[in-house]
Amino acid sequence: MLVPTVIEQTARGERAYDIYSRLLKDRIIMLSGEINDQMANSIIAQLLFLDAQDNTKDISLYINSPGGVITSGLAIMDTMNFIKSDVSTIAIGMAASMASILLTSGTKGKRFALPNSTVLIHQPLGGAQGQQTDIQIAANEILKSRKKLNQILHETTGQPLDKILKDTERDNYLSAEEAKDYGLIDEILVNQKKD
């Protein structure tokens, strides 16, 4: 992947940053692509760094992801809840599966989506092979994960658990407006221009 470089003029001359490092200076973290352990470690490190730098300022987490590994996503979510800084979440493009959990786990009142964003909620996906007992263990783990994720959705959206169970039975795509009505986000951002 080609990462753009930004040149910044300072009193000491020019300084080149990769775009993600420059955004980090403004307390912006980009979560894009599949959520896995490597991505989670990077996002967690950035959250911890920004919180240690100044825990009175918000951190903006921009999300464009098809989802990914549940344990990796939950590690990011736990860190978002652990740090003192408020974490504002913004869906750009797609916030699917585990990414939708991260979107709705932002600080209440600071969960946003851009107008053409799509949010996908569904039950956890998984597969197993091997001996029957191993398959049963994996199936039980998926059921535990589903219960945990539904509880998170219940707590962050205010929707009844039985509605969430029904709504996540199959892929459930929501527009930004539908995600707002559901309680996954608080507002739809149209533009940042000041009047």
From Swiss-Prot:
Entry similarity comment: Belongs to the peptidase S14 family.
Source organism of this protein record: Lactobacillus gasseri (strain ATCC 33323 / DSM 20243 / BCRC 14619 / CIP 102991 / JCM 1131 / KCTC 3163 / NCIMB 11718 / NCTC 13722 / AM63)
GO annotation, biological process: protein quality control for misfolded or incompletely synthesized proteins
Main location as per UniProt: cytoplasm
Keyword line: Cytoplasm, Hydrolase, Protease, Serine protease
Catalysed reaction, written as an equation: Hydrolysis of proteins to small peptides in the presence of ATP and magnesium. alpha-casein is the usual test substrate. In the absence of ATP, only oligopeptides shorter than five residues are hydrolyzed (such as succinyl-Leu-Tyr-|-NHMec, and Leu-Tyr-Leu-|-Tyr-Trp, in which cleavage of the -Tyr-|-Leu- and -Tyr-|-Trp bonds also occurs)
Enzyme class: hydrolase
Taxonomic lineage from the root: Bacteria, Bacillati, Bacillota, Bacilli, Lactobacillales
Subunit structure: Fourteen ClpP subunits assemble into 2 heptameric rings which stack back to back to give a disk-like structure with a central cavity, resembling the structure of eukaryotic proteasomes.
Identification of the protein by name: ATP-dependent Clp protease proteolytic subunit
Gene Ontology cellular-component annotations: cytoplasm; endopeptidase Clp complex
Alphabetized GO MF terms: ATP-dependent peptidase activity; ATPase binding; serine-type endopeptidase activity
Cited NCBIfam families: clpP (TIGR00493), PRK00277.1 (NF001368), PRK12553.1 (NF009205)
Compartments, record wording: Cytoplasm
